[in-house]
């Protein structure tokens, strides 16, 4: 998956990420850009407009929760399937989330990182993060196989 150099780069960079801000923005953008994903969050209240979604405190809180889990994965890059086994089971068996949504969220996260970090989020770092989000999406989809 990742070389030792790539792991060091993504881990060092991840230390600069404010998961509360980035998580809320990433989940919010997912819900706006891919509105069919909103059906999993009907209990979050008003998701009727982009502004409503992006300013929704429940979206922000859940986005932080999602990125807290992602942060845990960043500490276990060699065992993503093990790290995300319980979440894979939850999303498959109880929530019935389409595993394609994990890929979408990963790609949205990369967009948000690029937006927030600008030139610091180099093309090489983006390539490394694409590997990470693909690995996390695969781990979350593992229960579906």
From Swiss-Prot:
Transmembrane segments annotated in the record for this chain: none
Record's subunit section: Heterotetramer of two alpha chains and two beta chains.
Protein name according to UniProt: Hemoglobin subunit beta-A
Record's keyword annotation contains Nucleus: no
Tissue: Red blood cells.
GO MF: haptoglobin binding; heme binding; hemoglobin alpha binding; metal ion binding; organic acid binding; oxygen binding; oxygen carrier activity; peroxidase activity
Keywords: Heme, Iron, Metal-binding, Oxygen transport, Transport
Record: residues binding heme b: 62, 91
Domain Globin span(s) in chain numbering: 1-145
Family annotation (InterPro entries): Globin (IPR000971), Globin-like_sf (IPR009050), Globin/Proto (IPR012292), Hemoglobin_b (IPR002337), Hemoglobin_oxygen_transport (IPR050056)
Native source organism of the sequence: Bos javanicus
Family the UniProt entry places it in: Belongs to the globin family.
Superkingdom to which the source organism belongs: Eukaryota
GO cellular component, one term: hemoglobin complex
Task of the protein: Involved in oxygen transport from the lung to the various peripheral tissues.
GO terms for biological process, alphabetical: hydrogen peroxide catabolic process
């Amino acid at each position: 998956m990742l070389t030792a150099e790539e792991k060091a780069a993504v881990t060092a960079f991840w230390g600069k990420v404010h998961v509360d801000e980035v998580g809320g923005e990433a989940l919010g953008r997912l819900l706006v850009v891919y509105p069919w994903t909103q059906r999993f969050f009907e209990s979050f209240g008003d998701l009727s407009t982009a502004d409503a979604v992006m300013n929704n405190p429940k979206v922000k809180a859940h986005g932080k929760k999602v990125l807290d889990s992602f942060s845990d994965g960043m500490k276990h890059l060699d065992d993503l399937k093990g790290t995300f086994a319980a979440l894979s089971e939850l999303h498959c068996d109880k929530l019935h989330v389409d595993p394609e949504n994990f890929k979408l969220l990963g790609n949205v996260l990369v967009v948000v990182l690029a937006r927030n970090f600008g030139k610091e989020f180099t093309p090489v770092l983006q390539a490394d993060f694409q590997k990470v989000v693909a690995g996390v999406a695969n781990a979350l989809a593992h229960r579906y196989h």
